[in-house]
Amino acid sequence: MSSARTPLPTLNERDTEQPTLGHLDSKPSSKSNMLRGRNSATSADEQPHIGNYRLLKTIGKGNFAKVKLARHILTGKEVAVKIIDKTQLNSSSLQKLFREVRIMKVLNHPNIVKLFEVIETEKTLYLVMEYASGGEVFDYLVAHGRMKEKEARAKFRQIVSAVQYCHQKFIVHRDLKAENLLLDADMNIKIADFGFSNEFTFGNKLDTFCGSPPYAAPELFQGKKIDGPEVDVWSLGVILYTLVSGSLPFDGQNLKELRERVLRGKYRIPFYMSTDCENLLKKFLILNPSKRGTLEQIMKDRWMNVGHEDDELKPYVEPLPDYKDPRRTELMVSMGYTREEIQDSLVGQRYNEVMATYLLLGYKSSELEGDTITLKPRPSADLTNSSAPSPSHKVQRSVSANPKQRRSSDQAVPAIPTSNSYSKKTQSNNAENKRPEEETGRKASSTAKVPASPLPGLDRKKTTPAPSTNSVLSTSTNRSRNSPLLDRASLGQASIQNGKDSLTMPGSRASTASASAAVSAARPRQHQKSMSASVHPNKASGLPPTESNCEVPRPSTAPQRVPVASPSAHNISSSSGAPDRTNFPRGVSSRSTFHAGQLRQVRDQQNLPYGVTPASPSGHSQGRRGASGSIFSKFTSKFVRRNLNEPESKDRVETLRPHVVGSGGTDKDKEEFREAKPRSLRFTWSMKTTSSMEPNEMMREIRKVLDANSCQSELHERYMLLCVHGTPGHENFVQWEMEVCKLPRLSLNGVRFKRISGTSMAFKNIASKIANELKL
């Protein structure tokens, strides 16, 4: 085993020197042993391997990175593998990558995405991250609208707990937003994407503008230096408002308008928001950063602890690491690991295959199938993975409950070497399906309890939640006739694309258009009360000036913007009559997370409407619809970094390859294929098209409708079709999956839609048309 690596030095915000790579692995010869791929004699349709992970499919792409859904071969646990091409990163980008890595390695909180393993070659870095199967909070809001305050409180307590934990470790996130909040299989929060995070010291100011403009604190727009935590506190206020109201407190048709509204500090309070919640917001959204509450103070707030009077939210106390769990140790010994290397890897925080196996054995599976895991013996070719830093990663919802059937639709990854195939011998062990007390700090019974989500996935409603009834009306408050965001009809009309400026491709994320149009029709006109801040900053125009040595955009975030199979994000409403909302799209620079180095471009664009970017020849702006738009008036598309004037790259316009068992498959493979059954979806509320028809009949109906709409399709699995519509290279081109799934505990089947590539609007148009024409 190699010795512990020297930790990365603290990086200055302005420092742009080339970081040394020696800390990643001082022995280049060991790198070649870190990866084992497929034996050339294995079947052609077998998925490639990286280390102990079988790659299942691509779930995100960027200019310099890619994310693959993978399965840990030894334990069967699903993970996300982020593949970063180091040769494409400049020195500044490498610095931020290493800083992100260092930060992720010291964070052990149950509501923060966890790093498992790092594998490095000379040109490529493979990062194995925790997998959150529930998708983004953003997608949940898109599909369901605002949360009731009880649900919002459960989520927000977890968010505050995790962010306060970061602050007590002198780490500031700087990019908190609904898109960076994930949900696991039990609907618990997982904070992701620490690419803009940094270490702070009170008295040493940070001076870089970074973050997403709608969530950015006013002092960032003014170009002031910051301590750090106060900008996270402001962003948390925006998040709380978004959870409870379903809209952003500050928006505008362009960056200049947004900036003016943030600096004015005025926002609308919807009538249904409780007084306690309104009072809490006033502690977050204070223009003067020195007067904003600390998170320790926020934890004691009345609204935060409603229903938790005997369990007041307190700072999380990280439990002592558990490096000697006898159950996991014995399991690993039975796989072929020695007790000495297990202890050395854990105590030394190697982040190698040994540590990853130990951690994964302690993690609860996101699978629906049960409490058993199949363990395989360790491969004979020993691996020693480098203890390299690892960036944060956006984890994704599972796309397959059966690894035998999953075939990757894009198996091209950087530098996957070949190696001997794995042993076929396996042994089954009944293992607890819960997380034991372990070194990651994910112990539910620690000194400060981690806020739990009271909403198990199977109890989710399929329809959009009704308006909250816990309104506190004040007769002394002037009320507007506009609603912040309750027009649910538009939820079925827009779709989302996720990503970050100049890195994430449109195909890195699926889109959504799921909601019931009937809900908003029955709603009375909503009223609002207004609240304005008492501090009015100078009305300067534009964003703060930049210097030539400001930070440049980080390269490591694109793969993190890809909860591809979010249960709430990929199902199409059958209603398609509501108007499209595009005044606040996710795919434009005005909503992108960026560093100060990008401000020159931003200033050039700040007078453009949100729906138009200079890169988009076809972008057209719709008139601003006031405060009454749906969440799609804020979030209609994800960030797109590819210049839309450029044609689709070959990597994006993939030719669909059949992955069904054909003439090259064995008789056993063919038999397994014939006997395959629809997989069960954990979240019943993600099913929008349900039927009591037999799965085979549903597949025939789907193919019939696809043919009628000139859509090409190929059988990817027994009950999954890969579909294509439009002309490659054109805006109407879209690829998506249609899968027949079983609803747990019900005698019904449903159809799941998931976008693979193409614009969100193109996907929405064809998917809505198909959903409407299906006769199920």
UniProtKB/Swiss-Prot annotation:
Disulfide bonds: none annotated. It holds the Pfam family KA1. Disruption phenotype: Mice have no embryonic defect and are viable. They do not display obvious neuronal phenotype, possibly due to genetic redundancy with Mark1, Mark3 and Mark4. They however show an overall proportionate dwarfism and a peculiar hypofertility: homozygotes are not fertile when intercrossed, but are fertile in other types of crosses. They also show immune-cell dysfunction. As mice age, they develop splenomegaly, lymphadenopathy, membranoproliferative glomerulonephritis, and lymphocytic infiltrates in the lungs, parotid glands and kidneys. It catalyses: L-seryl-[protein] + ATP = O-phospho-L-seryl-[protein] + ADP + H(+); L-threonyl-[protein] + ATP = O-phospho-L-threonyl-[protein] + ADP + H(+); L-seryl-[tau protein] + ATP = O-phospho-L-seryl-[tau protein] + ADP + H(+); L-threonyl-[tau protein] + ATP = O-phospho-L-threonyl-[tau protein] + ADP + H(+). Residues 323-362 form the UBA domain. GO terms for biological process: establishment of cell polarity; establishment or maintenance of epithelial cell apical/basal polarity; intracellular signal transduction; neuron migration; positive regulation of neuron projection development; protein autophosphorylation; protein phosphorylation; regulation of axonogenesis. The active site is at residue 175. Residues 53-304 form the Protein kinase domain. Belongs to the protein kinase superfamily. CAMK Ser/Thr protein kinase family. SNF1 subfamily. Homodimer. Interacts with PAK5; leading to inhibit the protein kinase activity. Interacts with MAPT/TAU. Interacts with MTCL1; the interaction is direct and increases MARK2 microtubule-binding ability. Interacts (when phosphorylated at Thr-593) with YWHAZ. Interacts with YWHAB, YWHAG and YWHAQ. This is Serine/threonine-protein kinase MARK2.
